[in-house]
């Protein structure tokens, strides 16, 4: 394989060993049972990707599905904090066991394995990617309908590892309203196409804020460009989520499961359709 390989055989004439090879995903823990794997990605940080992962898992749990969240953001884990989970994950001869949230959502994160959750994880890329892979191969995801993989921003080692190692059934892209989103979303879409992973659609976060006095929607970051970006890439806009102080407060308190907003129902519908295919 060439060092310049993009993993997209359709535009390559080289007769390398990867051509026409079926994807070789890593086998999960033998005690695991996962029906669908959903990757939640973003082209840059700070757009609310982890919050979207958490709320989407909550939305599916309310529909009666058993959900799990694999926190693949090793150097910036936030999923346990959102759910108010501060314990240590336990392991036995079957593997490492995720910790369940109040709603029964299985959570695995590097913060559940370190001595102090405030200790930084200072690892190089290959070690980080290896840890994410072990969250799939060593953790027992028992009878999970939807496993949401909260990935770090960008298109680096971890997303590549996830797409190559896990049987990802669909990707949700989280973006913000700024015009810059066009280029950022394009990068995520192009990577998904290279790895032959289907896109479920785009979630626009921080889309607007609701005036507490008159109820008017105020576009804090200017006019949204998500519809034109979605149309350009033939994608659906799954949700437009507002800036909500209540959500911020509940997240800080580890009570995200009690948030009453239902802005991600469209994204939940897209995930649910995967089970019916």
Put a short name on every predicted segment:
Residues 114-162:
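Phosphate-binding/switch loop-helix module in NTP-utilizing enzymes
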Residues 66-67, 72-117, 122, 129:
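Phosphate-binding loop that captures ATP/GTP phosphates
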Residues 49-54, 77-80, 151-159, 181-184:
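Short glycine/serine/threonine-rich phosphate/pyrophosphate-binding segments
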Residues 1-25, 189-277:
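C-terminal lobe/tail of nucleotide-utilizing enzymes
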Residues 31, 36-74, 189:
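Walker A/P-loop phosphate-binding motif and the immediately C-terminal alpha-helix
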């Amino acid at each position: 394989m060439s060092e310049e390989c993009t993993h997209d055989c359709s535009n390559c004439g080289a007769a390398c060993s990867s051509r026409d090879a079926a994807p070789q995903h890593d086998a999960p823990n033998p005690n695991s049972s996962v029906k669908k794997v959903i990757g939640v990605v973003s082209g840059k940080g700070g757009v609310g990707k982890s919050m979207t992962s958490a709320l989407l898992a909550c939305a599916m749990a309310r529909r009666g599905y058993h959900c799990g969240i694999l926190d693949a953001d090793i150097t910036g884990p936030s999923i346990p904090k959102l759910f108010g989970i501060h314990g240590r994950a336990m392991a036995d001869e079957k593997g490492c066991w995720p910790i369940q949230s109040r709603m029964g959502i299985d959570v695995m994160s590097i913060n559940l394995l370190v001595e102090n959750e405030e200790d930084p994880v200072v690892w190089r890329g290959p070690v980080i990617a290896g840890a994410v892979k072990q969250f799939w191969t060593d953790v027992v995801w028992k009878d999970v309908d939807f496993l949401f993989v909260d990935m770090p921003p960008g298109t680096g080692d971890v997303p590549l590892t996830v797409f190559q190692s896990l049987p990802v059934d669909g990707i949700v892209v989280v973006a913000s309203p700024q015009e810059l989103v066009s280029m950022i979303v394009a990068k995520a879409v192009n990577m998904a196409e290279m790895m032959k992973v289907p896109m479920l659609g785009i979630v626009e976060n921080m889309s607007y804020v609701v005036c507490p006095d008159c109820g008017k929607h105020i576009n804090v970051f200017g006019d949204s460009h998500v519809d034109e970006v979605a149309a350009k890439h033939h994608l659906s806009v799954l949700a437009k989520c507002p800036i909500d102080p209540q959500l911020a407060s509940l997240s800080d308190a580890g009570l995200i499961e009690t948030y009453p907003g239902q802005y991600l129902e469209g994204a939940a519908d897209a995930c649910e359709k995967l089970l019916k295919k």
